[in-house]
């Protein structure tokens, strides 16, 4: 009888130990899956921008951050703005032809540091707050117009905000000429109307990005934005 009780105790103890081990393993596994899933979600939301299709077609937006080791050779324009030296010949040719056509563009903004980008965003948020927006709404609205540091094409040196010398022509003159002709020089209007849901940025008729002549012509003819174009290359 004692042997039987002793045997039952051993069986019971082994069963309890098994349950503890099983339950502990299950919880640990579930936690690992949950944490791993969180990591995957974060990774899907925040990729590092890739130059797989060439430096000209690197997509930088709110979901694709500029690599920490990204390098460029900057050159300074006559008005103090800076751009990637690789796009200078095409930008200069475009501006020369525009002026010959009676249109007078200039680069209002070129390359920006992360600190400069942050300051612009902060100023935009402050402006909306002064208009009575809540903190959350001010931030959300500001980010429709100003990219977070690390997600702005201005930090690539490949994008320029173009304005008009209004003493000689109107802004509309410049924007209309650029819409019709910029692709010939490898530039596209990066944030066109009707594409905000894809680009994440409201229509900016002044923001132009160098993508190379071949891609620019195909984007111009198709009506795609850069995200759609690169997606079609995959």
Give each language-model segment a name.
Residues 2-13, 17-234:
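Extracytoplasmic cell-surface/polysaccharide-interacting catalytic and binding patches
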């Amino acid at each position: 009888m004692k042997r039987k009780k002793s045997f039952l105790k051993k069986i019971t103890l082994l069963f309890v130990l098994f349950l503890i081990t099983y339950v502990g393993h299950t919880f640990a596994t579930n936690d690992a899956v949950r944490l791993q899933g969180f990591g995957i979600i974060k990774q899907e939301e925040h990729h590092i921008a890739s130059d797989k299709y060439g430096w000209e077609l690197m997509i930088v937006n709110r979901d694709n951050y500029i690599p920490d080791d990204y390098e460029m050779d900057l050159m300074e324009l006559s008005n103090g703005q800076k751009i990637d030296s690789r796009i200078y010949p095409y930008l200069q040719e475009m501006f020369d032809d525009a002026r010959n056509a009676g249109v007078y563009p200039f680069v209002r903004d070129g390359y920006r540091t992360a600190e400069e980008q942050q300051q612009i965003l902060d100023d935009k948020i402050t402006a909306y707050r002064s208009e009575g927006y809540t903190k959350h709404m001010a931030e959300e609205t500001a980010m429709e117009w100003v990219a977070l540091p690390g997600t702005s094409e201005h930090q690539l040196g490949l994008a320029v905000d173009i304005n008009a010398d209004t003493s000689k022509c109107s802004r509309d003159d410049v924007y209309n000429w650029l819409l019709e002709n910029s692709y010939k020089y490898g530039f596209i209007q990066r944030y066109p109307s009707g594409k905000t849901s894809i680009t994440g940025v409201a229509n900016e008729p002044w923001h132009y990005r160098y993508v190379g002549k071949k891609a620019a012509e195909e984007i111009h003819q198709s009506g795609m934005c850069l995200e759609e174009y690169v997606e079609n290359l995959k």
